[in-house]
Design a protein with these regions (language model features):
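Acidic, metal-coordinating catalytic segment for phosphate/diphosphate chemistry
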Residues: 1, 125-153, 166, 227-228
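A conserved beta-turn-beta hairpin within the catalytic core of GNAT-like acetyltransferases
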Residues: 18-22, 170-174
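Conserved acetyl-CoA binding element of GNAT-fold acetyltransferases
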Residues: 24-29, 174-181
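Unchanged
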Residues: 31-54, 64-118, 183-206, 214-277
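Local beta-strand/beta-hairpin segments that build beta-sheet-rich folds
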Residues: 59-60, 211
Length: 286
């Protein structure tokens, strides 16, 4: 979301090459394999609008399932940033999926055809599309994987921290990790986080807010069967509270990526072998 000093919003219009020609959207697009999502939004702004931008905050993380004109169904996870212009000159994209970029007053934007996620982000009233029937998850490559994962820095009223240990045979095996994992097809990140929390630790939690957005790229990762995979995961981390903690136990089926779960005091956590994500989240949370 990029706003001018007078409140106008920067929007782009879908071209004939897009799934929805003539429909307006916030600038942005897909994350390339191995790319940090923050770098992706800066790149997409430059491509679609000619403007250089700097990120000032993370607005939200959302997901939607949309029926495309060709009859297929697409699940998209979206990270919405707040950005400010730092340079460049406004111009349309050339031979891309957008054909116009404009600063639009909010009152005018409310009357434009907007993609649903854009209308929601701007707080504009619109008719919610009908729910899309969701079939089986489309197949994806196993040698080059890009996933979207939701994780939690989980605490209880006593200040303990909940961690899950990565099973041997998985990347990071033996390290203590944040509860969480990949989002399922048609699942929101929040729902995925709470589902994974129960599967990996037997806890029921409440999401209090977003802590961070990041990624991990490991082109030489090995899967559980020892098969090489060009692995890229985009990760969102939430603050999660378990008001009524129970004994931590793994409930997901044998063969999953977690082999143990436990509550720890902050002093105990300091002596554990932690995953990179767990270390980063604990440092960010203070």
């Amino acid at each position: 979301v990029c706003r001018a000093a007078d409140g106008r919003i920067l929007l782009t219009r879908g071209s004939h090459r897009s799934a929805f020609p003539g429909v307006w959207s916030l600038p942005g697009g897909g994350v390339d394999h191995g790319e940090h999502p923050a770098d992706a939004v800066v790149r997409e702004f430059a491509e679609e609008t000619g403007l250089a931008v700097a990120i000032t905050g993370i607005r939200s993380v959302v997901a939607d399932v949309v029926a495309l004109p060709d009859g297929s169904v697409e699940h998209t996870d979206r990270i919405l940033y707040d950005v400010t212009v730092t340079g460049g000159d406004l111009r349309p994209e050339t031979d891309g999926t957008t054909d116009l970029a404009e600063w639009v007053p909010p009152a005018v934007a409310a009357g434009l055809p907007l993609l649903p996620f854009t209308a929601r982000a701007l707080g504009t009233q619109f008719v919610e599309p009908d729910a899309v029937p969701v079939g089986d998850e489309p197949p994806y490559r196993t040698d080059r994987v890009q996933r979207f994962g939701a994780y939690g820095l989980v605490t209880d009223p006593a200040g303990r921290i909940l961690l899950a240990r990565i099973a041997e045979g998985y990347p990071g095996g033996g390290l203590w990790h944040l509860p969480g994992g990949g989002t399922d097809y048609a699942e929101t990140p929040e729902a995925a986080m709470l589902r994974e929390l129960y599967e990996e630790t037997s806890q029921r939690g409440r999401i209090e807010g977003l802590l961070s957005v990041g990624h991990r790229y490991d082109p030489a990762a090995l899967g559980p069967e020892g098969v090489p995979m060009d692995w890229h995961v985009i990760r969102v981390v939430y603050r999660v509270v378990v008001e009524e903690p129970v004994t931590a136990a793994v409930t997901e089926a044998a063969g999953g990526s977690t082999d143990r779960a436990s509550w720890f005091t902050p002093d105990e956590v300091a002596g554990l072998p932690l995953s990179e994500l767990a270390r980063e989240a604990l440092a960010q949370a203070g």
